[in-house]
Structures are given as structure tokens and as C-alpha cells.
Amino acid sequence: MENKTKRIKPLFVVDLLMALLGAASAYTGVEIHYAGHFQEHSAWHGWSVVHVVINVAWLIVCFLHCKHHWAWYKSLFKGMPSCSRKSKITLIVNFLFAATAFTGIGLLLFAEGQGTHLGLHHYVIGIALTALCLGHFIKRFSILRKGLRRK
């Protein structure tokens, strides 16, 4: 007897995880910023630990996401004659993600606590990333919703 149940494609699970972890990253990032201004250092530290754990998971899922879309990345290096508006925004999202990741890693390796200039840059770049990721997600939400349905 043939198994008729369809499985959800891993691509859509990865996309859903990207959205959930991205939202969690943004939330904990704002909590860190708030705690740095209005709460004790222990609250700032606690949110920082949660933020790092979430973002390590997000980074892993991001690599899986990029692997699924590797053909798009390869097309960039083959010299597309004209980059569409959608591709330009996706490129900016990629650039902001990399900038946020590198500043975050820099904070982990070199910062001595809260209130650093690098931390402020990380926060501002993270806000820009969040705004563009939200638009990126909204544009593709119907595709994700259809892909997550079992048929």
C-alpha cells in the first residue's frame, strides 16, 4: 500500500524558522537596548545571553536558507545583465544581515560590557535589517503559507 501523506518541504520549514528566529532576535535586541537604559546590568546580561543563543540558531538556519537559494547567489556572480528591484532589496537584506552578524561577533569577541559604540552600530543596523526582513517576509508570506500546508 502506498503512503499518501505528503510531507512539508524542508525549504518551507527553514523559511518559517528564519521568520520566527528573526522575530525573536529583533525582540531580544530591543530588550537588550531597553535594559541598557532602564534596568540593572543583570537584566541586560540575561537578555544578551538569550539574544546570542537565538542568533547562533538563526545563523545556522540562515546558512541552510542560503543553501536552498544557492542558484540565486550563483546567478549574481555570473553577471546578471540587470538586477531586478526585488533582487536589489534581497541583496540589501543579505548585506545588512552580514553587517549585523559581523558586528554581533565583534561584540562577543571584543566588547567589555554594555554601552559600546559597536553595540550602538549593531543595534541601528539590526533595526534596518528588521524593517527590510519584515518587508521581505510579507512579500513572500502567501508562498510560505501555501508551502507549509500538507496536501
Language-model regions, residue ranges each:
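Membrane-embedded alpha-helical bundles that constitute the cytochrome b-like, heme-associated redox core
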Residues: 1-151
